[in-house]
Each structure stands twice: as C-alpha cells, then as structure tokens.
Design a protein with these regions (language model features):
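Mid-to-C-terminal Rossmann-like scaffold of FAD/NAD(P)H-dependent oxidoreductases
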Residues: 9-15, 21, 34, 296-409, ...
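Beta1-alpha1 glycine-rich phosphate/pyrophosphate-binding loop at the start
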Residues: 11-92, 130, 180-203, 332, ...
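A Rossmann-like FAD-binding core segment of flavoenzymes
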Residues: 38-40, 82-84, 88-109, 116, ...
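Rossmann-like dinucleotide-binding cores of NAD(P)H-dependent redox enzymes
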Residues: 72, 166-168, 174-230, 312-316, ...
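Short hydrophobic core segments
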Residues: 116-126, 247-256, 320, 399
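Glycine-rich dinucleotide-binding loop and its adjacent helix/turn
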Residues: 123-186, 221-222, 279-281, 501-505, ...
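FAD-site-proximal beta/loop scaffold in flavoenzymes
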Residues: 139-163, 234-239, 245-322, 418, ...
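Rhodanese-like catalytic fold shared by cysteine-dependent sulfurtransferases
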Residues: 430-441, 445-472, 476-482, 489-520, ...
Length: 565
C-alpha cells in the first residue's frame, strides 16, 4: 500500500521551481498543485510555449493535422489559472547556485537577469537536436531541425512559400522517418541519408528491411552507410562521404538528440551516460534539493538494468507525476526504469517495439534466442485481415522476455502493448499462450498473434524444436547443410534459398528415403509454421532437424539479392 504522509506535507509550504515545460515539466507542475494548495510553484520556460504536442509536429507540417492550435496542449493563461502557477515564458535559467539555493534567470527578450530562491528545484530541460560541424552548414539557407513549435512554423512556412520539389532528410530515426512521410504527403521528392545500414534503431535489421521495402514503394530514395561530407552552394548540394552528390531544395537534420545538461554540468551536478543528468530512483541529482526528469536524465534500462538515455514522451510524463508524489511523501515511489516502448507510423505501416533488441544484447554479451511469427491482424475469414509480423527475443533457459518488435498495417500497437505489459509483470514466454485476450473475428483470432508467438517461443524453451536464423542459413548450406523447402511447387515462383530441395510438406512422409539420416536437416517454408510441422515429423523419425525461423518470406525480404529462381 502506498503511503502519503499528508499531515507532514500539508504543514509545509515550499517554493518549488520547475525548469522547463512540455511533457515532464508541465506534468510535474500540475500534479504538484493537485497535491498541495499551499506550495508556491514557479515554472520557467525558455520558449514561448509551455505544453505542446511535440510528437504531432511532423503531422502538422504534412497537413494531416490542419489546425495549429490543436498542437498547443495548454496555454500559459489557462494553465496558470487552473493550477495557480507562476509561469514565466521566454525566461532562461542560466545558472544554479546550489549553496544559496537560488537560480539566475535571464529574460530572453531583454537580456535582463535576476535571482530566484527555491526550496526544491526540478530540472526538465529536455533534449536538443544534434547539429554536427558539417562544412557549409552555417551557409545553408534551408536547413531545419525539428524540436518545437517555432521550428515547425519555419519548416511549414518554407514549404508553403517556396514550394520545394526535393528534400533531403539526414537521419533515419523516428523524427527523420516521420518527416520523410509528411514531406511526401506534401508532394515533395525525398532522399533519406543514414550512416547506419537501417532506419529506426530500436528495431533490428531484418525488421527494418520491411520498412525499407515499404518506403521504396512510396518513392523514397534511401541512402545507407553513407554520411554527409559537406553542404555546398548554400545547402542546395549535399556532398556525401562516398562522393555522391544530392541536389536538393531543403534539408531536415534529424541525426538524433543530446541532453540539455549544460546547466546541470555548470552547477557541478553529476552526469551520466551520453552527458545525461545522473539521478537516483527518486529522481534526485547529486544535490538532494535538485531533481531532474525527462529526456535529459540517465535512466535504468528495465530489461538489462544498465544505465542509458531514452528520450521519449511516455517516460517524461510518468516521471513528472511520480516525482510530484515523491516530493509529497509517497515513501515507496521508486522509478524502476524504462523499457523504451515505442510506435511509429511509416506511411501505411505501423512499426512498434518494446524492451531491447539484438544489437544491445550482443553488446552486453547476454545470450538470447529469437523467434519470428507472422499472423493475421484478425480472423482471416473476416474481410481486410492483414499480416502482423512479431519478433520475440528471450532467454532460452528461463523464458525471460528481453524485447519484442512488430510491424504491419493493423493491430500492431496492441500486440506490443500486451507484450510490454507482460514484461513489466515479469511474465515469461511460457505465460504468453495463456493470456486471455479479447476475441471476435473483426478484431483478432481465437489464438491471438501474441499467443502464437508465445507458442513458438515456448516450443524452443521446451526443446520441441531448434531454429536457425535468416543470416545463418546460407553459410550452413554452403558448408554442406541439407535444406528442404516444404512449400508447394506453385509457391516456388516467389524464389528459393540457394541450395534448397523442394519436398512439399504433404509428401514428406512418403519421401523420407530422399532425406539423409547422416546429416542435420534444415527446413524452410513460407513463414515458418509448416517448417515446424515438418521438423517435428522428422524429429519423431529420429532425424536431427532445425527450422529456418521466419521462413522464406523473412529471408527473401532481407536478402532479395540472394534469392534464386
């Protein structure tokens, strides 16, 4: 039972200063007032807007959101009145004086400064776009970053007035990909340049391959494993490190964000990974009277328990509310970490993930197993069912779920949300098949895709099947591995994995004489399910068998150049 020491809190009247608004700052200020009418609460915001829908900004640029006013979640006037807050916009905190417990505030329009005392100081400065020192960047006349409403206004005004024909987006993270879509919505040709070999870092390469395929369908030019060497001719020419040249009318720089931690650093507060502000489980910095929340802080990864930076709106909002509770005496409120659950729209595709990916687990030397399952978003016999591909990453011995990724046109978000909830509750892959999820033909199947991926993972944990991954099978076949494709002959026109032998599943029992007993057998099909059935059949006959996880569909999407016909 959570305990709040009400009498002690109510007898105290404190001056609480919140630095920064939007998700974290606005959330903590509102909750603080709901918990106490006595405290003096001051919110100091460098910009003009204290609370806006930063995740909606690309969609206003693209014309999907048509009313600018809808981006403004709270105005200064409305929030001041409702919550009795002293809100000071266009005011920047330039110094923290820890010993005196004061801050120095600068009016950004007049440059005048003054000091303000505090009993409790809360930092919610957020994160800012990374702007590297690219030669020619200062001379680029149509180069933009996207963080706030003024940035949005500048980009939209440029598009409306100049009507650019081509845009270059540098960076393939969430903001970059969302900007690509919304620029295409405006009829602008787009080239995306990304240093890595994929978009959207939270998902793994093979899942991103589906996103790449979808973006190409929407006429987006993708340039991977290349960076910007220089901007020339006032930013109308982008010269890449490979020597390639892109002629463009505008540039969106979206290579990532860095924490706004200089204020904390100058005050001597301890910093963490990537320059984040280091905090404990109660959001206290190295100074017990100074707290920090939001994109600028170091958080614990819920899965690996390592320190990291996860700049997302969900954690910032929850941290704000929790910190207000902590300040008001909730003795057992502790922040247990962030899983980084996220979702993004990429044209007609929804892409979501939770937990950690393979890249992180490899870096930390944590052993793991992977399974891919493709199932319909709802019952296949009900109209308009579309495939959902789910990737589950887990511990083969314990069944602990490390992470999940999913993509499709419909029903993706709710599947990831269910798995995220299971992870938070410390459920294992063995528990997923028993989750009693809502079912009716328009919404799901009697065995939901979450149940199905649980069955597939449980089969591995229980030893009913072994698998190999899409990136392993070519090497195996090249070194003498015996690969059977159990699809029907008419399916082979889609292509095959080089070196595979076709024995349709329903003929396999009658053709066992063609399957050598002295070799390990590998099975592939279209998606993996028939491969599992074939693997079980052969295992019962005494064969050593492994199933190609995800089947030919996964292999062919990720490695189309290796498919044979």
């Amino acid at each position: 039972m959570r305990k709040l020491n009400n009498m002690e809190v109510r007898n105290m009247s404190r001056k609480i200063v919140v630095v920064g608004g939007v998700a974290g700052g606005a959330s903590v200020a509102a909750r603080l007032r709901r918990l106490s009418e006595e405290d003096e609460i001051i919110m100091v915001e460098r910009g003009e807007y204290i609370s806006f829908a930063n995740c909606g900004l690309p969609y206003y640029i693209g014309g999907v959101i048509t009313e600018r006013q809808k981006l403004l979640v709270q105005t200064v006037e409305r929030m001041s009145k409702r919550f009795n807050l002293d809100i000071r916009v266009l005011s920047e905190v330039v110094k923290i004086n820890k010993e005196e417990k004061t801050i120095t505030i600068k009016n950004v329009t007049t440059d005048e400064t003054y000091n303000e005392e505090y009993d409790v100081l809360i930092l919610s400065p957020g994160a800012k776009p990374i702007v590297p020192p690219i030669p020619g960047i200062e001379e680029a006349k149509a180069l933009f970053t996207l963080r706030n409403v003024p940035d949005t206004d500048r980009i939209k005004a440029y598009i409306d007035e100049k009507k650019p024909r081509h845009a270059t987006v540098i960076g393939g993270g969430f903001i970059g990909v969302e900007m690509v879509e919304n620029l295409r919505e405006r009829g602008i040709e787009v080239t995306l340049v990304e240093m890595a070999n994929q978009v959207m870092p939270p998902i793994d390469y093979e899942m991103a391959a589906y996103v790449h395929e979808h973006m190409k369908v929407h006429n987006v030019e993708l340039v991977f494993e290349d960076g910007v060497d220089a901007l020339e001719e006032n930013g109308t020419v982008v010269r890449l490190k490979s020597g390639s040249v892109i002629k463009t009318d505008m540039i969106i720089l979206a290579i990532g964000v860095q924490p706004e931690s200089s204020l904390a650093k100058d005050a001597g507060l301890a910093l963490g990974v990537r320059g984040t502000i280091k905090v404990n489980e109660k959001f206290q910095t190295s100074d017990p009277y100074v707290y920090a929340i939001g994109d600028a802080i170091e958080v614990k990864d819920f899965v690996t328990e390592t320190e990291t930076m996860i700049p997302l709106a969900w954690p910032a909002n929850r941290q704000g509310r929790m910190l207000a509770d902590i300040i008001h005496g909730h003795t057992d409120s502790l922040y247990k970490g962030t899983m980084g659950t996220s979702v993004a729209k990429v044209f007609d595709l929804t892409v979501a993930s939770t937990g950690v990916n393979e890249k992180i687990l490899k870096r930390l030397n944590i052993p793991y197993e992977v399974v891919h399952v493709q199932a319909n978003s709802h019952a296949g016999y009900y109209p308009n069912a579309t495939p959902v591909l789910i990737k589950l990453i887990f511990n083969k011995d314990s069944g602990k779920i490390y992470g999940a990724q999913a993509l499709g046109r419909d029903g993706v978000d709710k599947r990831i949300d269910v798995i995220a909830t299971a992870m938070k509750a410390n459920l294992t892959v063995i528990d997923l098949p028993d989750l009693e999820l809502s079912y009716a033909p328009p919404y799901s199947s009697a065995k939901d895709p979450v149940n199905m991926v649980g069955y597939a993972a449980s089969n591995i944990v229980d030893g009913f099947v072994d698998t190999v991954q899409w990136h392993e099978i070519d090497h195996i076949v090249e070194n003498g591995g015996y690969l059977i494709d159990v699809r029907e002959p008419n399916e082979l026109k889609q292509g095959m994995i080089k070196g595979s032998i076709n024995i349709p599943l329903d003929e396999l029992r009658d053709r066992l004489d063609e399957v050598p007993m002295d070799k390990e057998i590998y099975i592939t099909c279209q998606l993996g399910m028939r491969g599992y059935v074939a693997a079980r059949m052969l295992m019962e006959k005494g064969y050593k068998v492994k199933n190609v996880d995800g089947g030919f569909k996964l292999y062919g999407t990720v490695l189309p150049e290796r498919v044979v016909y």
